[in-house]
Amino acid sequence: MIKQRTLKNEIRATGVGLHTGQKVYLTLLPAPVDAGIVFRRVDLNPVVEIPAKAANVGDTTLSTTLIQDGVRVSTVEHLLSAMAGLGIDNAIIEVSADEVPIMDGSAGPFVFLIQSAGIVEQNAAKKFIRIKKPITVQDGDKSASFLPFEGFKVSFTIDFDHPVFRGRKLDATVDFSSTSFVKEVSRARTFGFMHEIEYLRSKGLAKGGSVDNAIVVDKFRILNEDGLRYEDEFVKHKILDAIGDLYLLGTSLIGEYKAYKSGHGLNNKSLLELIKQEDAWEMVTFEDDEVAPISYIKPLLAV
């Protein structure tokens, strides 16, 4: 049986919020079977819990923000991407502010935290949503589709009219039956344009943003001294974001997600459309590991 997973131990980290620039304390804790991923604002009294579900997405400007009764947790996508990539079904995420720390702008530090905490299987079947028929959502020239596929695959195309992107690979497909999330996707950093960062700062945002936690691009070039971590790091980060946004389904996905110029808004819009069209998917579990289209390496190997 493919079983649900949680963390073995509690683990803590600190970082800065991308927008506030303030120090944020982060704690990842184990959670019981079927709890899902739940964010907990421990700086509030009483403490507020927000389940990581698509219906709780209240803002997709610049990042994915969960909102419940006016309480927010922003920039959840990179941490959720790490949870999805390592197959964590149940966890409590405590934060001391209204945003998850940006760390280095990728999911890499979160992968390291989860692996350091350890991963344990729980005595219940892992749930998957399997796509049965195609669904496409358009937004102007942008599009996002869910397609039937026996496995999990994300295909993404970006399009920027900018010198840095000319001659670069602007599309990528990652089939997770043959590609390691940890090695090939998790280290891709978020990117931003200098003029946008300056504008955001004038509005009191992006105070924590720097070359330490993003790929920063000016009119002509990449400003980071060390350059890129992958040749196709830009589009790989979009795939990383999509994996995190899709994990707001509350389960792992069996199917393909194909996106053209999509962002957090369209990722969420397509997810809500999928949930609404109940004949387009089915919930499945696997009693027999051998017949499962997605193989999850035994947790011990992930440590």
From Swiss-Prot:
<keyword id="KW-0444">Lipid biosynthesis</keyword>
<feature type="active site" description="Proton donor">
    <location>
        <position position="264"/>
    </location>
</feature>
<protein>
    <recommendedName>
        <fullName>UDP-3-O-acyl-N-acetylglucosamine deacetylase</fullName>
        <ecNumber>3.5.1.108</ecNumber>
    </recommendedName>
</protein>
<feature type="binding site">
    <location>
        <position position="237"/>
    </location>
    <ligand>
        <name>Zn(2+)</name>
    </ligand>
</feature>
<dbReference type="GO" id="GO:0103117">
    <property type="term" value="F:UDP-3-O-acyl-N-acetylglucosamine deacetylase activity"/>
</dbReference>
<comment type="similarity">
    <text>Belongs to the LpxC family.</text>
</comment>
<keyword id="KW-0443">Lipid metabolism</keyword>
<dbReference type="GO" id="GO:0046872">
    <property type="term" value="F:metal ion binding"/>
</dbReference>
<dbReference type="InterPro" id="IPR020568">
    <property type="entry name" value="Ribosomal_Su5_D2-typ_SF"/>
</dbReference>
<feature type="binding site">
    <location>
        <position position="78"/>
    </location>
    <ligand>
        <name>Zn(2+)</name>
    </ligand>
</feature>
<keyword id="KW-0441">Lipid A biosynthesis</keyword>
<keyword id="KW-0378">Hydrolase</keyword>
<dbReference type="InterPro" id="IPR011334">
    <property type="entry name" value="UDP-acyl_GlcNac_deAcase_C"/>
</dbReference>
<dbReference type="Pfam" id="PF03331">
    <property type="entry name" value="LpxC"/>
</dbReference>
<comment type="function">
    <text>Catalyzes the hydrolysis of UDP-3-O-myristoyl-N-acetylglucosamine to form UDP-3-O-myristoylglucosamine and acetate, the committed step in lipid A biosynthesis.</text>
</comment>
<dbReference type="GO" id="GO:0016020">
    <property type="term" value="C:membrane"/>
</dbReference>
<keyword id="KW-0479">Metal-binding</keyword>
<keyword id="KW-0862">Zinc</keyword>
<dbReference type="InterPro" id="IPR004463">
    <property type="entry name" value="UDP-acyl_GlcNac_deAcase"/>
</dbReference>
<dbReference type="InterPro" id="IPR015870">
    <property type="entry name" value="UDP-acyl_N-AcGlcN_deAcase_N"/>
</dbReference>
<feature type="binding site">
    <location>
        <position position="241"/>
    </location>
    <ligand>
        <name>Zn(2+)</name>
    </ligand>
</feature>
<comment type="pathway">
    <text>Glycolipid biosynthesis; lipid IV(A) biosynthesis; lipid IV(A) from (3R)-3-hydroxytetradecanoyl-[acyl-carrier-protein] and UDP-N-acetyl-alpha-D-glucosamine: step 2/6.</text>
</comment>
<dbReference type="GO" id="GO:0009245">
    <property type="term" value="P:lipid A biosynthetic process"/>
</dbReference>
